[in-house]
């Protein structure tokens, strides 16, 4: 069942009679594409900040652990997703926690500086100090020229995170972490009407906030091949190819399936072709 609360929050519930666990997921329609090109990496930074507690609940993980639960999150270009899995009898603990940090995240300068250091170190380890680490970034910048898909969720450069001010971070939170920009889903062996009632109890009192302006630019159609050669101190040469496809509702939305068939692992067609040609020693 699906319901939109008075403050704009979309709630989707599903009764699962098999599991004794409840899965509570909240998706914010705020990803890397919603960032200022001069301040990239904010969506991923918030994935970290959202676990740093609120004024009412300073330690987010402790109540989850006391409820015998687990939690995590991930960010991509289109959205940021948070989830908690715990025994169904403790489902309100998850709703309490998620509703609290949707409105009352405590972003102190000290917490911000700590998470900025963590994210910058992650950037360096995974993308700058690792062989081939910057290859996906080079490919993105080649494939997209104006659309924000041209940068990864980690951001364009560590300096964007290093230079982020508390006011800029707070503005991003207020603009994107609001009821009408989120989807709450609950799956548990609980009556669906009961789950909707619980969602209303914990989330409907939250005030909505004005929507952030959408400045996402349309990517021009690519009319000619693009190539880039980057010289790096790496053990072997690698080649990456990328092809534009239609949106998720277009017939070409099956492209990820073809990608898996062609290049998804040792049994894929391209792997056999490269190996049989003698170009690869693997």
Task: Show the residue positions of the predicted features.
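Charge-rich, well-structured scaffold segments of protease-associated domains
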Residues: 4, 12-15, 62-211, 229, ...
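Mature N-terminal segment immediately following signal peptide/propeptide cleavage
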Residues: 1-25
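M16/MPP (pitrilysin/insulinase) zinc-metallopeptidase core fold and M16-derived inactive scaffolds
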Residues: 23-85, 151-155, 263-280
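Serine-centered coil/turn micro-motif
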Residues: 130, 147, 249-250, 267-271
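A cross-taxa feature marking solvent-exposed loop/turn segments within ectodomains of secreted
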Residues: 19-21, 57, 179
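Primarily extracytoplasmic ectodomains and periplasmic/lumenal surface modules that are beta-strand-rich
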Residues: 18-21, 33, 192-194
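His/Glu-based metal-binding/catalytic segments typifying zinc-dependent metallopeptidases
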Residues: 124, 141, 211-267
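Generic solvent-exposed, charged/amphipathic alpha-helical segments
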Residues: 196, 200, 258-259, 271
């Amino acid at each position: 069942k699906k319901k939109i609360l008075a403050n704009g929050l979309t709630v989707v519930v599903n009764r699962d009679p098999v599991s004794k666990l409840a899965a509570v997921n909240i998706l914010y329609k705020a990803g890397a594409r919603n960032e200022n090109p001069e301040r990239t990496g904010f969506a991923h930074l918030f994935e970290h900040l959202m676990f740093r507690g609120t004024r009412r609940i300073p330690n987010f993980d402790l109540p989850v652990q006391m409820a015998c639960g687990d939690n995590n999150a991930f960010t991509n270009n289109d959205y940021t997703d948070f989830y908690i899995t715990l025994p169904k009898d403790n489902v309100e603990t998850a709703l309490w926690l998620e509703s609290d940090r949707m409105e009352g995240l405590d972003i102190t300068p000290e917490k911000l500086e700590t998470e900025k250091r963590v994210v910058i170190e992650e950037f360096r380890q995974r993308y700058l100090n690792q062989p081939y680490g910057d290859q996906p970034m080079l490919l993105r910048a080649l494939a997209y020229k104006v659309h924000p898909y041209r940068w990864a969720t980690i951001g364009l450069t560590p300096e964007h995170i290093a230079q982020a001010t508390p006011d800029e971070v707070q503005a991003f939170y207020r603009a994107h972490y609001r009821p009408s920009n989120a989807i709450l889903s609950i799956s548990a062996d609980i009556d669906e009407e009961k789950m909707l009632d619980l969602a209303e109890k914990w989330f409907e009192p939250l005030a909505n906030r004005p929507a952030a302006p959408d400045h996402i630019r349309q990517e021009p159609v690519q009319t000619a091949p693009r190539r880039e050669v980057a010289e790096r101190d790496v053990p072997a040469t690698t080649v990456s190819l990328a092809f534009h496809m239609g949106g998720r509702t277009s017939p070409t939305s099956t492209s990820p399936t073809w990608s898996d068939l062609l290049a998804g692992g040792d049994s894929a067609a391209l792997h056999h072709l490269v190996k049989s040609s003698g170009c690869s020693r693997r």
